[in-house]
Regions:
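Aromatic-rich, lipid-facing transmembrane alpha helices and their immediate juxtamembrane interface loops
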Residues: 1-179
């Protein structure tokens, strides 16, 4: 079990120190990395097909933004604000930014998921789908993201270590923010 920390890092203006007792099962880590890689390959093939078919680079540009902006800019800042931690022994760390480890499964997961969700939303809006259906689609995406985070916390791939109201290990604020 991950210990909850209440102390701050020296000189960090109240930023909570991350846990040092969280470890990842290496085999499970590599399996997750493989699964998100298959998802990325599917997204990449879809991006090429859709870009050629529609002669519109939007899907491909969303894939690039999902691979660059979210994991390397949004994720590290959000991890500090929400007191989120990926263990340093996670297989295949892509980068350490602002003292936060960003595993490749996070980078690849963003690259695989962001373009699909955004492009699907774009297609629904341009097709004139009513707001009720758009909100239902958003709810489905948000719920699936919540379940993925709950599983990641349960299996030790990540931890929320602040003083949060938790739902199956995930802060209520994170579930709302991901919506």
């Amino acid at each position: 079990m991950v210990a909850r920390h209440t102390r701050s890092l020296p000189g960090d203006s109240g930023i909570l120190a991350p846990p040092n007792d969280l470890h990842v099962n290496q085999t499970a880590g590599w399996i997750v990395l493989g699964l998100v890689s298959v998802a990325l390959l599917t997204t990449l093939v879809s991006a090429v097909i859709i870009t050629r078919r529609d002669r519109n680079p939007l899907f491909l540009l969303l894939l690039i933004s999902g691979a660059v902006l979210f994991p390397f800019f949004v994720e590290p800042a959000g991890d500090i604000i929400l007191a989120t931690w990926y263990p340093p022994d996670t297989p295949a760390i892509a980068a350490t930014i602002l003292g936060r480890h960003i595993p490749w499964f996070v980078v690849i997961g963003y690259a695989a998921g962001i373009p699909v969700a955004c492009y699907a939303g774009y297609q629904m809006i341009t097709a004139g789908l009513e707001a009720k259906r758009l909100l239902l689609a958003l709810a489905a995406i948000s719920l699936s993201e919540g379940v993925i985070e709950m599983a990641a916390v349960h299996f030790g791939f990540m931890s929320y270590y602040g003083n949060h109201a938790l739902i199956f290990g995930v802060p209520l604020s994170s579930l709302v923010q991901n919506a």
